[in-house]
């Protein structure tokens, strides 16, 4: 039996997937582990790229998009790792992250699931790194905006557990599916992911069932980066439908015993939220089609700071000239010097790192120190000769 099985469900995000596996290979260096990618019928050459560049990765090819839950369950049933890590393809894992997490879980045998400190592309902390169970009352606080108004309040801010410290392990309730380390014996007891959830909500449901099964869910302060949404399209009608439908599925599954007087207002709030999201989406698209809004290539409107070896910066110079990018070139990731450079830039800036000379752990550390500036992360991908940003692949 292997110590760890890593499962990645992929759908049309080839560049992010290759980057994710590059970071994984470094993080798994001294761990007996296997990587399984379940591809939900991608059409962007993801499978061919995996076979070419990462032949050690096991690939399961689905004939159609079966959804996140079912795809993960397929891989879980075919593997035997003591721990199972569900990982989004649009993530970067620091070199120390997985070994630190496994050591912690080994020391806490009552743990069921564990999540980590997720950073957004701009280096800020992703609040969904720690969440509470969305009970009717907690859901009301979230949907009404009270959670956002009082994020550190123990009652009103419980959805994101904003009152907990970030720099130490904490008991939490809901672990994000973007990085969800699971104990296989716990899965054997409470069951796999509920396939009624096509996408979204399955992590909430599984985390809740682990709690009901007597396990403890943890937050651990090791870092990963989550581009958050590059593996989905959050501006689509389908996203709005699937996301809010998942909320209703969870609500019906776990709180149907409550009276209509309690459940109906929450259900109505969910429907109203979904309707408002759709109206906003349709209005925005109408403005674009009528010429009242300018559609810009977000990634190419700001400044770029390329940090790495000469091989990397030379390749990025060619790309910059091709696309007319405003570019600065550095040979080391010194936060103090980078801050001085950023003081001279007026636009949103993308820091593009060289993964051959700068560790992923160092990249994330630098981004944390840039968190109050208008900065996003980028990387240069040697395999495809591409610049990967949070919003665009530039070649």
What are these regions (language model features)?
Residues 208-284:
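Active-site-adjacent helix/loop segment of glycosyltransferases
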Residues 8, 13-28, 316:
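Short, well-formed alpha-helical segments that are part of the catalytic scaffolds
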Residues 61-79, 100:
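Glycine-rich, basic loop-to-helix element that forms the pyrophosphate-binding segment
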Residues 84:
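Short aromatic/hydrophobic "clamp" motif used to bind/position activated sugar donors
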Residues 23, 39-48, 64:
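A conserved acidic beta->alpha catalytic loop
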Residues 165-167, 173-223:
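A short, conserved alpha-helix in the catalytic core of glycosyltransferases
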Residues 133-172:
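Short, flexible, basic/aromatic active-site loop/helix in glycosyltransferases
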Residues 92-128:
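Conserved donor NDP-sugar-binding/catalytic core segment of glycosyltransferases
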């Amino acid at each position: 039996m292997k110590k760890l099985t890593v499962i990645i469900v992929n759908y049309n995000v080839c560049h992010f997937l290759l980057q994710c596996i590059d970071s994984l290979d470094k993080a798994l260096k001294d761990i007996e582990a296997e990587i399984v990618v379940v591809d939900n019928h991608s059409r962007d050459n993801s499978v061919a790229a995996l076979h070419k560049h990462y032949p050690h990765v096991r690939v399961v090819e689905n004939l159609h998009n079966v959804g996140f839950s079912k795809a993960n369950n397929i891989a879980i049933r075919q593997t035997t790792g003591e721990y199972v890590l569900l990982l989004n393809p649009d993530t970067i894992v620091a070199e120390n992250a997985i070994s630190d997490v496994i050591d912690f879980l080994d020391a806490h045998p009552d743990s069921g699931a564990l999540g980590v400190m997720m950073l957004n592309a701009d280096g800020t902390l992703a609040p969904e790194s720690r969440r509470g169970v969305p009970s009717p009352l907690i859901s009301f606080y979230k949907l009404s905006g009270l959670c956002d108004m009082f994020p550190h309040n123990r009652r009103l801010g419980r959805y994101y557990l904003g009152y907990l410290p970030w720099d130490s392990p904490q008991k939490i309730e809901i672990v994000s599916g973007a990085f969800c380390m699971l104990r296989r014996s716990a899965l054997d007891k409470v069951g796999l992911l509920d396939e009624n959830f096509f996408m979204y909500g399955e992590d909430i449901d599984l985390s809740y069932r682990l709690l009901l099964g007597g396990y403890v869910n943890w937050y651990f302060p090791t870092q990963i980066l989550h581009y958050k949404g590059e593996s989905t399209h959050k501006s689509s009608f389908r996203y709005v439908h699937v996301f809010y439908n998942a909320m209703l599925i969870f609500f019906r599954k776990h709180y149907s015993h409550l009276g209509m007087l309690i459940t109906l207002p929450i259900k109505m709030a969910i429907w109203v939220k979904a309707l408002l999201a759709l109206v906003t989406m349709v209005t925005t698209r109408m403005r674009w089609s009528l010429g009242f809004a300018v559609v810009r290539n977000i990634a190419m409107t700001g400044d770029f700071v390329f940090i790495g070896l000469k091989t990397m910066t030379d390749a990025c110079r060619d790309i910059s000239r091709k696309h007319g990018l405003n570019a600065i070139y550095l040979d080391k990731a010194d936060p103090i010097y980078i801050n001085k450079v950023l003081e001279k830039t007026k636009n949103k800036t993308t820091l593009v790192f060289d993964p051959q000379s700068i560790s992923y752990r160092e990249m994330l550390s630098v981004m944390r120190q840039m968190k109050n500036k208008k900065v996003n992360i980028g990387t240069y991908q040697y395999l495809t000769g591409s610049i990967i940003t949070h919003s665009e692949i530039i070649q």
